[in-house]
Every structure is written in structure tokens, then in C-alpha cells.
Swiss-Prot record:
The chain crosses the membrane at residues 26-46, 57-77, 90-110. It is a multi-pass membrane protein. This is Putative uncharacterized membrane protein YDR199W. It comes from the Eukaryota. Partially overlaps VPS64.
Length: 121
């Protein structure tokens, strides 16, 4: 079976009057809520049909990028909807394209996982 390597990204939401991040484990589809803490950011993409089951709606897909030379600042790239990505392959392609277009930037505290190519968002 072939596998593809994807990056983890944040989904931003407001919970309990403070910024929080909804972490979605793509492998087991378990939702974990975590408050923003320093530079510790970790998340993966969620499937569209799971959006309605989250405690709060998450309207924007936010890629958190950190300039390599200035750790104190970050750049947010918003996509109107997760359904913008028709498949896991297009999602990976978009991330790869972004890394080429913005070489000085890197994903903040990026983590990686392997998923079957047959998976879809």
C-alpha cells in the first residue's frame, strides 16, 4: 500500500472566551481541545462531515507559518472552507506549493504522519 506524508495544521476556534485550537486526529478522528500555549502548535486537517460535530464551528482553515528568521512573528493563511480540498492529495499538493512560494517561512512546530493515498478530506 502506498502512503503519503502530510503536514499537521491548526484549526482555529473560540472556546470559553479565549482563543483555542481544535485538534483533529486524522487517523482515529478523535477531537482534542487545547489552548494556545507558547509556540506549541499541532493539528491535522479534519473531514468536512466532521465539522458539524465540533463543539464550535470552525469556518476557516488556518495555516500557521513561522518565519525562520523572526520566531516572534507568524503569518496566517486562511482558506474559506476545508471542502476546498477535494482530496488528501490536493491538500498535500497545496501545502507543497505553499512551501515553494514562501521559502523563508516554515510551518510552526510542524509534525508529520503517514496516511493511505485513498484517504480523503
Amino acid at each position: 500500500m502506498e502512503y503519503v506524508l502530510i503536514y499537521n495544521i491548526w484549526f482555529f476556534s473560540f472556546l470559553q472566551d479565549k482563543p483555542c485550537f481544535c485538534f483533529v486526529d486524522y487517523a482515529c478522528s478523535i477531537f482534542l481541545l487545547s489552548s494556545y500555549c507558547g509556540n506549541c502548535l499541532t493539528a491535522v486537517a479534519t473531514k468536512p462531515n466532521e465539522m458539524a460535530t465540533t463543539p464550535k464551528s470552525i469556518p476557516l482553515l488556518t495555516l500557521v507559518l513561522l518565519p525562520s528568521t523572526t520566531p516572534s512573528s507568524s503569518v496566517l493563511i486562511n482558506v474559506s472552507s476545508v471542502s476546498f480540498f477535494s482530496s488528501l492529495e490536493s491538500f498535500c499538493f497545496t501545502l507543497a506549493l505553499l512551501s515553494l512560494l514562501i521559502p523563508p517561512l516554515k510551518l510552526l512546530c510542524v509534525k508529520t504522519k503517514f496516511f493511505p493515498l485513498s484517504s480523503s478530506i
